[in-house]
UniProtKB/Swiss-Prot annotation:
It catalyses: 5-oxo-L-proline + ATP + 2 H2O = L-glutamate + ADP + phosphate + H(+). GO terms for molecular function: 5-oxoprolinase (ATP-hydrolyzing) activity; ATP binding. The keyword Nucleotide-binding applies. It comes from Cupriavidus necator (strain ATCC 17699 / DSM 428 / KCTC 22496 / NCIMB 10442 / H16 / Stanier 337) (Ralstonia eutropha). This is 5-oxoprolinase subunit A. Forms a complex composed of PxpA, PxpB and PxpC. HAMAP family: PxpA. Catalyzes the cleavage of 5-oxoproline to form L-glutamate coupled to the hydrolysis of ATP to ADP and inorganic phosphate. Its EC number is 3.5.2.9. Belongs to the LamB/PxpA family.
Amino acid sequence: MQIDLNADLGEGCANDEALLALISSANIACGWHAGDAATMVQTVKWALERGVAIGAHPSYPDRENFGRTEMQRDPEHVYADVLYQIGALDAIVRAQGGELHHVKPHGALYNQAVRDPALARAIVRAVRDFDADLVFFGLAGSQMIDIAREAGLRVKQEVFADRGYNPDGTLVKRGSPGALHEDEEVALNQTLTMVREKRVRAIDGTWVPIQAETVCLHGDGAHALAFARRIRERLGAEGIAVRAGD
């Protein structure tokens, strides 16, 4: 058994270089919610040195709120936004002799696309038009994944180690009770259950079927690095290999 571990990097956290030793895929901020050209260059360099798969992490133009505030942007504007950000990171990756592997939307853009098919189609179209061989990372079981598949893209269904789930398989909104698992043991057990048993316990206590193909580890927070080490060690102890795959 194997699983991909991904983390959002290039967002101004001090853990990036150390996290790259523990993950298999890196989603690099493209400057619109965090980071800049210099952080993109440095993070790509570190990822290439460690053989970590590199992905673009496009967002709404929202540095003030870290890309976590919902916006009502026209799908054509979103298409252009995403295409622009992928292109910027791809140029940096190619300049260093690497190859872009995937795209994962960030924050509010990601969560709104789970609910809004027009938004999801705009994001997916930008990815496909840029490079139809890129892998699309999206919320496991969501219409965003279905739309990407219908467009002919390869997908990785993403689950979250430290986030709470609603009974419909969506994430509990940040700031709401149960949105984040502060207890590392709870997050570890949730991850193993999702990977091994293909299910997750929702905040109402019900079990929700889920397909875990990549697990997101958040790189921010005081204990992020220690938790990443624990989850990597636990997966190894359970005989689960960590690798990006195709």
